[in-house]
């Protein structure tokens, strides 16, 4: 083990090497290059779904780099020929809300925000939590699909840093500070 000045020296040397090398953006779940969007399947193969104006395909070794926080689960391999409309019967939502949900899902395919917030509002037992779990499982499955509301700005930022979709359960109200913080993610 390196201690004291030896550790400090090693950090200084490695920092110097890092500063002289090319830097790369690191993405979480969804990344991009000049002409394509990539969705990390987060499996052992490190394959990704490449999306272009011509369609999509699964690729080995995508040209973008992804990070995978603890708790991130792999996405199932997509199958050609499906329709987003097959999702509608699984959700408790009306026709107008369904249009907003589809727009929200589409926005999540953009590697850089801003992103709209999706808020389910309703009485107890109206499948708000269930809807959140279903939608999160589509693009960002994780061990903890829904979290408790954040108590501090730091809690919110940690949650947002560790998942592509941050979903909170039993958020009875959104105060001004939390509203501002959510808009800054």
Identify the function of each model-found stretch:
Residues 165-185:
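Conserved AAA+/SF3 P-loop NTPase catalytic/coupling segment centered on the Walker-B
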Residues 45-46, 125, 172-173:
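Conserved nucleotide-binding/hydrolysis micro-motifs of P-loop NTPases
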Residues 36-37, 127, 170:
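Glycine-centered small-residue hotspots that permit tight backbone geometry or close packing
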Residues 1-96:
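Segments of Walker-type
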Residues 47-51, 129, 175-177:
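Short helix/loop capping segments that flank catalytic or ligand/cofactor-binding pockets
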Residues 53-164:
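P-loop NTPase catalytic core of nucleic-acid-dependent motor ATPases
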Residues 38-40, 119, 166-167:
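Structured core elements
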């Amino acid at each position: 083990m390196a201690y004291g000045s030896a550790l400090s020296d090693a950090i200084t040397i490695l920092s110097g090497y890092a500063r002289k090398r090319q830097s790369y953006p690191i993405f979480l779940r969804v990344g991009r290059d000049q002409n394509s969007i990539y969705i990390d399947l987060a499996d052992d193969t490190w394959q990704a779904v490449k999306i272009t104006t011509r369609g999509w395909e699964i690729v080995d070794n995508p040209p973008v780099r992804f990070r995978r926080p603890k708790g991130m689960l792999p996405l199932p391999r997509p199958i050609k020929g499906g329709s987003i409309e097959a999702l509608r019967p699984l959700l408790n939502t009306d026709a107008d809300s369904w249009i907003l949900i589809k727009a929200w899902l589409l926005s999540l395919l953009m590697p850089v925000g801003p992103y709209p917030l999706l808020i389910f509002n309703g009485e107890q037992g109206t499948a708000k939590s269930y809807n959140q779990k279903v939608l999160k499982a589509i693009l960002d499955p994780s061990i903890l699909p829904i979290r408790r509301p954040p108590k501090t700005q730091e809690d919110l930022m940690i949650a947002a840093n560790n998942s592509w979709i941050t979903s909170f359960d039993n958020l009875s109200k959104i105060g001004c500070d939390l509203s501002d913080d959510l808009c800054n993610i």
